[in-house]
Amino acid sequence: MPLQLLSQRLEKTQHDGLYRSLRSVERTTPQVFVEGRQALLFCSNNYLGLAEHPSLAQAAADAALQYGTSSAASRLVSGNQPLHAMLEAKLSAWKGTETALLFNSGYAANTGIIAALAGRGDIIFSDRLNHASIIDGALLSGARLIRYPHNDTLALARLLEQHQTDGLRLIVTDGVFSMDGDIAPLQGIADLAEQHRALLMVDDAHAGGVLGQQGRGTVDFCGVTGRVAIQMGTFGKALGSFGAYAACSRLVRDYLINRSRSLIFSTSLPPAVLAASAAAVELVQAEEGQQLRQQLTDNSHLLRYLLQQAGYKVPDGCTPIVPVMVGEAETTTRFSTRLLEEGVFVQGIRPPTVPKGTSRLRCTVMASHSPDQIQQAVAAITRVGRELGVL
């Protein structure tokens, strides 16, 4: 009977056009094989192309040979190794904070940080389009969750005025929003946090390595360095490695070490990952990192311009996330399938990841894409869009 219930629920998912399955993708380069079919990759978060960079691969290999393949314990037992402290020091110097604390993934970081900071009697103010891990962290915390309209600082100000508490008030926002590629108005949000004595946390997963001086992210890009209590970032996107971190004060770090369950009850990141991440942090601050960021920006502008010229209502912007709105989930799935047949791999994004009626192709561009590859992708998106009546 229990399995029959699961089967019925899965059948409904299929009926609603929301069924998901896994596809095998070889490597993260612009040209890949997807289940044996050659295609241009336009849905990877490998923004700077560092996942294939030889310096990261060499650092990982050297660390595995020197330290082994696993930390074999949580950091509070015996899994706190010198490489953890080394990487945290590099992170805090890069992000301009007192210190930093590593987590095993962006999801583990957001759920672990938010559920540790807030609890009953506290209030969390979250942008309506924040990542699911932020929402899940808020729900796990037991705090009251108030979601404000997307990037609307006037609405946030009203909500902060209306909802007082003797406990903690925490404002959480994405820096770059993962489905639309737009940037949070951090100047205004930081002003409100200070005015209303609230903590401010920014999820900078999609901006680290991409925006700001030396790729420091949206906090630097928006000019609010020193005004954000917690900067959450990841290594699995522009930095080409794996894991996540909180760049913060020593007080917040100590608090999280004692309260964050996703940190306390997880085996810590392995040596190879730590070394690769450290190499990436160094690289994005160097001249090569600046060159890659410029190429990424140029490619983002080219992709947006060509899609706009084709007739798509694509927003202007400087981030590598470029949404092509489709609408219905079933049409989006067909669009993605047809694109793969045309030699372009772009995943369709459907509910619950995005609201109903806003399904889309989430195109992402990399620094390693050539102008010709971008033109090929747009030509295919244009052909299929006309075929399906989207364009």
Swiss-Prot record:
Organism: Trichlorobacter lovleyi (strain ATCC BAA-1151 / DSM 17278 / SZ) (Geobacter lovleyi)
Top EC category: transferase
Upper classification of the organism: Bacteria, Pseudomonadati, Thermodesulfobacteriota, Desulfuromonadia, Geobacterales
Entry function: Catalyzes the decarboxylative condensation of pimeloyl-[acyl-carrier protein] and L-alanine to produce 8-amino-7-oxononanoate (AON), [acyl-carrier protein], and carbon dioxide.
Keywords, ordered alphabetically: Biotin biosynthesis, Pyridoxal phosphate, Transferase
Similarity remark: Belongs to the class-II pyridoxal-phosphate-dependent aminotransferase family. BioF subfamily.
GO MF annotation list: 8-amino-7-oxononanoate synthase activity; pyridoxal phosphate binding
CDD domains: KBL_like
Subunit relationships: Homodimer.
Residues annotated to bind substrate: 20, 131, 353
This protein's name: 8-amino-7-oxononanoate synthase
SUPFAM superfamilies in the cross-refs: PLP-dependent transferases (SSF53383)
HAMAP family membership: BioF_aminotrans_2 (MF_01693)
Span of the signal peptide: none
Residues binding pyridoxal 5'-phosphate, per UniProt: 106-107, 178, 206, 234
InterPro entries recorded: Aminotrans_II_pyridoxalP_BS, Aminotransferase_I/II_large, AON_synthase_class-II, AONS_Archaea/Proteobacteria, AONS_Proteobacteria, PyrdxlP-dep_Trfase, PyrdxlP-dep_Trfase_major, PyrdxlP-dep_Trfase_small
Catalysed reactions, semicolon-separated: 6-carboxyhexanoyl-[ACP] + L-alanine + H(+) = (8S)-8-amino-7-oxononanoate + holo-[ACP] + CO2
Cross-referenced NCBIfam families: bioF
Modified residues (N6-(pyridoxal phosphate)lysine): 237
Gene that produces this protein: bioF
Gene Ontology BP annotations: biotin biosynthetic process
EC numbers for this chain: 2.3.1.47
Pathway of action: Cofactor biosynthesis; biotin biosynthesis
Required co-factors: pyridoxal 5'-phosphate
